[in-house]
Amino acid sequence: MSIQPKVIALGFFDGVHLGHGALLRRTVEEAKRRGVRSAVFTWAQPPKEVVTGVPVPLINSPEDRAWLAKSLYDIDDVIMVPFNKEMMTTSWEDFVTEILIKRYHAVHLVAGHDHRFGHKNQGTPELLKSTCAELGLGCDIIPEVTVGGITVSSTYIRRLVSLGQVERAMEYLGHPHILTQTVRHGRRIGHTIGIPTVNLVPPPHVLVPGDGVYIARVCLMDGSSYAAVTNVGTRPTVNNGSDLTVESWMLDFDGDLYGQSIRVEFYKRLRDEIRFDSLDALKAEIRRNADDARAYFASKA
């Protein structure tokens, strides 16, 4: 990590939604004004999960959180720190002075109106602002962001995504819900019916949209992207098992992506996952869904 001075945004940033965006824009703005680096300080895992031992479903993996902060908001550095016993027992004062200032060279801090930090969450935005003033650091506390009268929050967005309401979730995220994972081998049934797919198994405790068929875009690591029809679920027509998969038919793509990482962006839910009477019926419906996907992206061009 660079020893250069930094303006640091504080938070967990799950989803990197519009509320987080207000923090990140202010962070980059202040960093440019000072001629220093912009950074995010965040935890690799939810503190609540570590404290309680109960897994917390997340909108994004740590890697996707970092990618979104950098790609959407031009953050220079993402400081991703394990939430361990040392961090759990660090007082809020030491968190500011020993970690943010001495270890990561903060000269200005940016936090949300409801941010809590330090042992037992005893640090508050008010304490952060007064402490920064005493230490000669800059500090901004960012108010809540609302859309349509609803406060933008990761909790609300998690609910929308889990219900499959990805189009509505996008209003609060400011970008499509994404999932990045390595392509795995499937049963190649799609190839036999002329609809080859790429298959992902979602990482543990990362939210995928509710079961159904979606208009999506698949992005490759070389920067190219393709409109897609993506099925989330257990593929009842061809599979008697219960394993959840994310299966995408990339339109106008011909290639082998096995073993490569791809990013799936979810734009709109088309329908429920359905058990069809035959593969021909399944094929015909997927092709109709592909027409819907082409029309959707053409309307956005």
Where are these regions (language model features)?
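N-terminal catalytic cores of NTP/NDP-binding nucleotidyl/phosphoryl-transfer enzymes
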Residues: S2-S61
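Residue-level signal for inorganic ion chemistry
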Residues: H17, A69, L109, A169, ...
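A structural preference for short, hydrophobic beta-strand core positions in alpha/beta folds
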Residues: V40, M80, I141-I142
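N-terminal Rossmann-like or analogous alpha/beta NTP/dinucleotide-binding catalytic cores
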Residues: P47-L135
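Glycine-rich, Lys/Arg-enriched anion-binding loops that position phosphate/diphosphate groups
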Residues: C132-T234
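Phosphate/ribose-recognition catalytic cores of enzymes acting on nucleotide-derived substrates
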Residues: G186-A301
